Amino acid sequence: MISFSSFYKQIADSSLQHWLETLPAILGQWQREHKHGTLPKWEKVLNKLHYPTPDIIDLKNSVSIGSGQQLAKGEREKLENLLRIFQPWRKGPFSVHGIDIDTEWRSDWKWERILPHLSPLNNRTVLDVGCGSGYHMWRMLGEGAKHVVGIDPSTLFLCQFEAIKRLAGDHHPVHLLPLGIEELPPLDAFDTVFSMGVLYHRRSPIDHLLQLRDQLRTGGELVLETLVIDGDENTVLVPEDRYGKMNNVWFLPSAAALELWLKKADFIDIKCVDIDVTSLAEQRSTDWMPNESLVDYLDPTNVDLTVEGYPAPKRATFIATKNQPNKDLT
C-alpha cells in the first residue's frame, strides 16, 4: 500500500505540523477504502520500478530524470511498458531514462507563462490544489521550494506521480495526497498556493477561493488559473449542460468578474498576469493519451466555439495576496 509516512516525518518540525492532528486518520481511511479495485494492481506495477539512481535530474528547465545512458535497450523498453500501464497521461511532459512521455497537455508552456510573475519559490512551502500527476510540483521544486504538497483525489494521478517519484528518488520533498481541498482544515501555513484548472469545476467558486485563502499564511501568495470569457465585471457564463463536452463546468467569469470575486474573498494586490487562448498544439491527443482532446471539443467549422456553441477555452492567471485577518467571510 502506498505509504505517507515519509510525508508525516517531513512536516513534523514544520509549519504544517498541526496537520498531523487529523491527516493520518483521513489518509488511513483512504487506504482502507482502496484495498480493493485498481489500486492494488497499479501498486504491483509501482513495485517493479527498481532502477538505478538517475545520473542526472533536471527540474529547472524540464522534468527530466536520467540521461538514457544507464539502461540497456531492453531495460528501457520494459520501463516504458510499465509506465504505459498508467495511461492516459494528461499533464507533463516527462523524460525518464530516455523515454519521452508525451502527455496530452504541454504543461511546461503554462509554467513558462506564469513563472516570471511568481514571487520566488526558493525556501517556500507550497500547496498545489488539483495537481494532477504532479508535473508543476516538480517544477516548483526545481525553483527551490522547501516543501511541495499536491492534493488531487484521482488514484490514477497518484500512481503516475508515485511512478515518477520512485524513479527520481523518494528523498525529494514533494508529496501528493489523494484528497480534495474540502478535506483540508484551515492550515494558514503555506507561503504559496496554486489552483490551476480547478475553479470552473467547483459548484461554489467563492467557497473555493475562501478555502484557498484558509491554506495561506497572512501575506502568502495565491496563483489562480481558470477558464474565463470576455466581458465586464457582471459577465459570468453558466453552461446550460456541457462545456467542451465536460459536464462538470459550473461558472466561467470574465477576468473583471473574477477580480471582484477575489476582492470579495479578501485578497489584495490582485493582478491578472496572463490571458491565453488554449491552442490545439498545447492540448492534443498523443501516443500516451490517445483519447479525445481539445480538437474534438471545438466546433469543426469554427474553432472559436465549443461544440455546444460557447466561446472556446480561454485561460486567465491571477496572482493575489492573502490580506490581514480583519473580517469574517465565513
Curated annotation (Swiss-Prot):
The keyword Coiled coil does not apply. It catalyses: carboxy-S-adenosyl-L-methionine + 5-hydroxyuridine(34) in tRNA = 5-carboxymethoxyuridine(34) in tRNA + S-adenosyl-L-homocysteine + H(+). Homotetramer. Signal peptide: none annotated. Gene3D superfamilies: Vaccinia Virus protein VP39. Belongs to the class I-like SAM-binding methyltransferase superfamily. CmoB family. GO terms for biological process: tRNA wobble uridine modification. It holds the Pfam family Methyltransf_9. Carboxy-S-adenosyl-L-methionine binds at residues 91, 105, 110, 130, 152-154, 181-182, 196, 200, 315. It is an enzyme of class 2 (transferase). SUPFAM superfamilies: S-adenosyl-L-methionine-dependent methyltransferases. Keywords: Transferase, tRNA processing. The keyword tRNA processing applies. This is tRNA U34 carboxymethyltransferase. Catalyzes carboxymethyl transfer from carboxy-S-adenosyl-L-methionine (Cx-SAM) to 5-hydroxyuridine (ho5U) to form 5-carboxymethoxyuridine (cmo5U) at position 34 in tRNAs. GO terms for molecular function: methyltransferase activity; transferase activity, transferring alkyl or aryl (other than methyl) groups.
